[in-house]
């Protein structure tokens, strides 16, 4: 969204941050804000690409949630590309950028660990030193530890979907358009919808929900018998009560919500063993809350 929209606003209360996942901690920062400044790409994708994390949501989903979560009046979201220019900005230059883009800025909302400028030299106190009013939100906790995007990614990587969902305040989900597979599932009586998605998930089998009902999903390369069906991890969703998805809307993105991890992905020696495991997975999915 153009920054010109913000220039027409009076008394802008601006939330700043990357907000990957828009988790419960982020929502504390967003509370009371009527505008958001965020980056489209993760700063580490420029600063140190080898350390850039797998993201919890794509940029358009993040912008949509930042606009609407916890507010009756949609927020203006100013999403910009993080570039080498931003990476090398002195803190005072970033302050000038804020004043230029948001001349009617009343207050900045941020988390306690938010940093800006080259080498993260700018802090919330830096903004105060330049005359800004700053609201620093306290960490939200889950258990004895602070909620963070990093902690959520770690939970998902371990298969602890329930913990991740608790910190997100919603079910972790991915969205994508179905792609054609090799038809193995159909031959076994368990047809799947296949999605090429990048997610910080442990490889394995999950209980999921979709707009078409409950499902069992395998995230991995599908090493059923012999060679893997996919070179990179793919999400294969079997809808346990059936659905002719092709007749519904085959080109429409499908949202898949994760309820819990069932088991690691594994290779089977024969078709009968695989079919028995599919039946057990379906039974577990039906009994899941």
Report residues per predicted region.
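A non-catalytic, amphipathic alpha-helix used as a structural packing/dimerization or gating element
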Residues: 28, 61, 163-170, 273-284
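Phosphate/ribose-recognition catalytic cores of enzymes acting on nucleotide-derived substrates
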Residues: 182-289
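N-terminal Rossmann-like or analogous alpha/beta NTP/dinucleotide-binding catalytic cores
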Residues: 44-132
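Glycine-rich, Lys/Arg-enriched anion-binding loops that position phosphate/diphosphate groups
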Residues: 123, 130-224
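N-terminal catalytic cores of NTP/NDP-binding nucleotidyl/phosphoryl-transfer enzymes
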Residues: 3-60, 64
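Conserved beta-strand termini and adjacent loop/short-helix elements that scaffold enzyme active sites
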Residues: 1-3, 39, 79-82, 137-139, ...
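A general structural motif
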Residues: 10, 33, 74, 104-105, ...
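Residue-level signal for inorganic ion chemistry
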Residues: 23, 66, 108, 164, ...
């Amino acid at each position: 969204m153009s920054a010109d929209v913000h220039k027409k606003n009076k008394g802008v209360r601006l939330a700043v941050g990357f907000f990957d996942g828009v988790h419960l901690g982020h929502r504390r920062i967003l509370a009371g804000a009527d505008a958001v400044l965020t980056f489209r790409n993760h700063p580490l994708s420029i600063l140190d690409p080898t350390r850039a994390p797998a993201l919890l949501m794509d940029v358009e989903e993040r912008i949509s949630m930042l606009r609407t979560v916890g507010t009756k009046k949609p927020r203006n979201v100013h999403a910009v590309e993080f570039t080498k220019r931003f990476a090398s900005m002195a803190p005072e230059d970033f302050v000038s950028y804020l004043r230029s883009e948001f001349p009617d800025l009343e207050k900045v909302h941020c988390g306690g660990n938010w940093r800006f400028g080259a080498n993260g030299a700018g802090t919330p106190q830096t903004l105060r030193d330049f005359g800004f009013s700053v609201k620093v939100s306290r960490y939200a906790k889950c258990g004895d530890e602070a909620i963070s995007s990093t902690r959520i990614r770690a939970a998902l990587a371990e298969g602890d979907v329930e913990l991740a969902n608790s910190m997100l305040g919603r079910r972790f989900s991915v969205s994508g358009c179905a792609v054609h597979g090799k038809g193995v599932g159909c031959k076994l009586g368990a047809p799947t919808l296949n999605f090429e998605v990048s997610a910080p998930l442990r490889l394995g089998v999950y209980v999921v929900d979709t707009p078409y009902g409950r499902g069992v999903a395998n995230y991995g390369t599908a090493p059923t018998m012999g060679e893997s069906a996919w070179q990179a991890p793919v999400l294969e969703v079997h809808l346990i009560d059936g659905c002719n998805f092709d007749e519904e809307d085959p080109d429409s993105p499908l949202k898949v919500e994760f309820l819990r991890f069932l088991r690691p992905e594994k290779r089977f020696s024969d078709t009968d063993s695989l079919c028995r495991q599919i039946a057990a997975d379906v039974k577990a999915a039906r009994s899941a809350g």
